[in-house]
């Protein structure tokens, strides 16, 4: 993996939204002790190196500045394991709708 990105490369940045001292008192104490952080993906507006501050354009066309953390990051979220109880619903619904025509 390259440590440098070019303009328009898909990248991930990190920035601190709120420092620990700026956080509200209405959250659990252990949460209040750490900063609120954000990792966000988008296209680099100019070339940069991991660890440098860069600006990105997000898929929603927002411009966000932060520290470059990764170049060409993958998506790591999932919808979890398959719920076998739900796997037949699509076919059952199609059959029910077809009967109604």
From Swiss-Prot:
Gene Ontology biological process terms from the UniProt entry: ornithine metabolic process
Enzyme kind, highest EC tier: transferase
GO molecular function per UniProt: transferase activity
Chemical reaction(s) catalysed: D-alanine + acetyl-CoA = (2R)-2-amino-4-oxopentanoate + CoA
Keyword Aminoacyl-tRNA synthetase found: no
InterPro entries: OrtA
Family designation: Belongs to the OrtA family.
Protein name per Swiss-Prot or TrEMBL: 2-amino-4-ketopentanoate thiolase alpha subunit
Gene name in the database record: ortA
């Amino acid at each position: 993996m390259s440590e440098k990105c070019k303009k328009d490369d898909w990248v991930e940045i990190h920035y601190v939204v709120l420092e620990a001292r700026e956080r509200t008192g209405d959250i659990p104490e252990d949460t209040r002790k750490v900063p609120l952080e954000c990792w966000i993906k988008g296209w680099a507006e100019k070339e940069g190196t991991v660890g440098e501050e860069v600006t990105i354009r997000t898929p929603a066309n927002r411009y966000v500045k932060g520290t470059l953390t990764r170049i060409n990051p993958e998506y790591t979220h999932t919808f979890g394991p398959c719920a076998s109880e739900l796997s037949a619903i699509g076919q059952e619904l199609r059959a029910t709708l077809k009967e109604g025509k």
